[in-house]
Amino acid sequence: MITTRNSARQRTEFTMKFAVIQFPGSNCDQDCLAAINGLDGLRAEYVWHKETSLDDFDAIVLPGGFAYGDYLRCGAIARFSPIMKAVIDDARVGKLVLGTCNGFQVLCEAGLLPGALVRNRSLRFVCEMVTTRVEVDDSPFTHGCPKGTLLRLPVAHGEGCFFADEATLRELNFNHQVILRYADNRGVVVPEANPNGSIENIAGICNRERNVFGLMPHPDRASDARLGSMDGAKIFRSMVETIRANRATEKSERVKQVA
């Protein structure tokens, strides 16, 4: 396993480091690493679940898979991995955190995102390409995609049905925390486009602060034209642009303080 202890001071202004967390049972970590490293100005590194610090990284990715065999519930054991304290602490101070598929489940179990992911309504494992519609275009993960943009992304899960009680659902909609919904090829949200029975066709949500995003589809598997879609790369690029803008703001503030 590859661990990371390089100093953040060694990074250039134009290079960003993403941490890809590896739990026992993760199987999309390589996909995430390849997708991120394929983008200019980005470098991803694996971080083993027993590590305790993510200070060297600009963003965190929790990949798909079957962390700890999905025993008890999907993500229920991974939530107690040593690295998760750092994930939670960094999320609370504004660092970008992305959870795909099993990573989304871990984020819900950790309390970083509301709701829960339960068994698909069909009681079957679903593996197919789906269409998602961007509902929010001012989040750090989708600001490069105008509202209504359609993203073709693959799904592969058995427990991807998003559920939330009525109060939580109202809050999600009121605060514009629903980032993606399953839709048909015309962009219409219909039951037939929903692969797992998720309430209100919800495919991905963010926290109220908008720096934590979880989705069941795999942007990492849609970041190479040879795989049939490059739409997933838009999510990673949006993260890069957000971090770059934040750096520019911080630099400007430092200049003002010196002046």
Residue ranges and their predicted role:
Residues 67-68, 104-106, 161-162, 186:
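Glycine-rich nucleotide phosphate-binding loop and flanking beta-alpha elements
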Residues 17, 88-92, 117-259:
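Amide-donor transfer/coupling interface in amidating biosynthetic enzymes
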Residues 103-104, 138:
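Short, flexible active-site-adjacent loop segments at beta-strand->alpha-helix junctions, enriched
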Residues 65, 102-103, 158, 219:
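Conformational gate/switch positions in structured elements
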